[in-house]
Amino acid sequence: MAGEELMKICATGHRSMTKVTYMVKAEGDPKEVYENSKLHLPSPLMASGTLVGGQIESVEKAPYYVLDANGEWIEDREHVTLYFTATTETPSGEVMTTKVGDQEVRIGKTDYILKSEYIEFQGGTVVDVRWGE
């Protein structure tokens, strides 16, 4: 595989890239954060103060639930669950170790930091990753 990739680089002058689309869930955020986030999308991805390629494309909201005094799940109307969709490109030979900055992007990864010029969420969970779409 490495030889084939090297031949592609030599023949074309660049590495082939694979588009990666992933979704990050952020729970328990104040409801106004949703509208404010939408104002700044799409927004380029950042890590350690530098652009890393790719962008946060969109955000969707869902209810956020908490336990009440009786142990029942109820909707917290002051907070929401947010689902951010981001895209990036990674060298095709490295698709199995997709990284954005220094962070690996894998389904189930917790404590993910989603950051752009205007948006930052810590403690997110990567809930979906699609390669090549």
Please tell me what each predicted stretch does.
Residues 1-133:
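Beta-strand/loop-dominated core regions that host nucleotide or nucleotide-derived cofactor-binding catalytic loops
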